[in-house]
Amino acid sequence: MTDQAAATSADRRELISFRVGEQEYCVDIMAVREIRGWSPATTLPQSPGYMRGVINLRGAVLPIMDLACRLGMPVIEPTVRSVFIVVKAGDRTVGLLVDAVSDILSINDDMIQPTPDVACDAVRSFVRGIISIEGRMISEISLDRILPEREAMAA
């Protein structure tokens, strides 16, 4: 393998893409622990509006975040196609409620374009960049920014 080919393959990352409403988003696949079908969450009083509640995942309490609500999109009730993607960023593990998982993408970092200024500040702060691939525009979510701090999850 040439040095250039080795560098190119080393720069590649895999992302998992999913739908929230009519939009497509993705996260780094290395942060994904599992994907589970939707099951109702137990709501917690005084929790932020984007937190659906908690579920029991093999004996551990897992907070479930409604990604549509967190992104400022209209909230719709989950359907049979809805899933939650269990992700881990740092010491935080959360289930992200999404409408459906779409695809596994393999990209180079130079394929990521900056979020345009037309997006609202909340979305721009949560989105790492935009990936144009196979005729689709996919926003990469920054888990470090979108996941609430532990205090906010417990509030």
Curated annotation (Swiss-Prot):
Q: Which UniProt keywords apply?
A: Chemotaxis, Cytoplasm, Nucleotide-binding
Task: Select a single GO molecular function from the record's annotations and give it.
Answer: nucleotide binding
Keyword check for Transit peptide, yes or no. Answer: no
For this UniProt entry, what is the primary localization, expressed as one broad class? cytoplasm
SUPFAM superfamilies xrefs: CheW-like
Give a GO biological-process term.
Answer: signal transduction
GO cellular component terms, A-Z: cytosol
Q: Which Pfam families match?
A: CheW
List residues of the CheW-like domain.
12-152
- Where, per UniProt, does this protein localize? Cytoplasm
SMART domains per the UniProt record, alphabetical: CheW (SM00260)
Q: In the UniProt record, does the keyword Nucleotide-binding occur? A: yes
Briefly state the protein's biological role. Involved in the transmission of sensory signals from the chemoreceptors to the flagellar motors.
Protein name, as recorded: Chemotaxis protein CheW
The organism is Caulobacter vibrioides (strain ATCC 19089 / CIP 103742 / CB 15) (Caulobacter crescentus)
